């Protein structure tokens, strides 16, 4: 069975989220909230496209920190809730607190439900479905994955979220829970991901691993990635110049 990381592996997040933030800020400055303080209006108006891209990258980093540090013994906090909380913090840090209404903040937090698939994702999944059961294995909550599947026409046979196990990757509870959910041994499962740290954690649980390099997704340096490759974290390596999921299907003879 093939499990897929989702953010960055199946869908591209950077531009999609930046577009929503940029549009919302322009609307707030030019059309809504006519009573915005002048200094807030000026700071928002001064935000460039590159500024919003950097904002989104920082938002993504808060997600990484949140999921990696989450203690499964605590009450579960959804990714949606984290995105909302982190958005408020990031706006405050930039002097943009008060730019958006609470309803708008939640709408923007849900921008992560509206991400576009990479160009090879849909067709690649269709091909892989001929030979394998396919499922998400994402830290995104269930409703988020349902929206991504619906809006992106992603042909997964199953949707599995870390939410199902009250933990977040890289906790072993998620990988082991996913295998157990389908009555499989970990060795009967493979994780497809664009992040080597995710694959290392899956490999330590007994999963097979498939690395699909995506633009601007890998956090490790080239030297660290080469070391990970040499140490056997990855069973199938699809580089950036290849054709993503379609290349995975080709290597399986599909």
Residue ranges with predicted function:
Residues 17-25, 56-63, 83, 105-112, ...:
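Hydrophobic alpha-helical core bundles mediating ligand binding, dimerization, or RNAP-core interactions
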Residues 76-84, 97-136:
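Short, acidic loop-to-helix structural element flanking the phosphoryl-transfer center
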Residues 122, 126, 137-254:
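Asp-based, Mg2+/Mn2+-dependent phosphohydrolase catalytic module
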Residues 29, 41-106:
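A metal-dependent, Asp-based hydrolase signature
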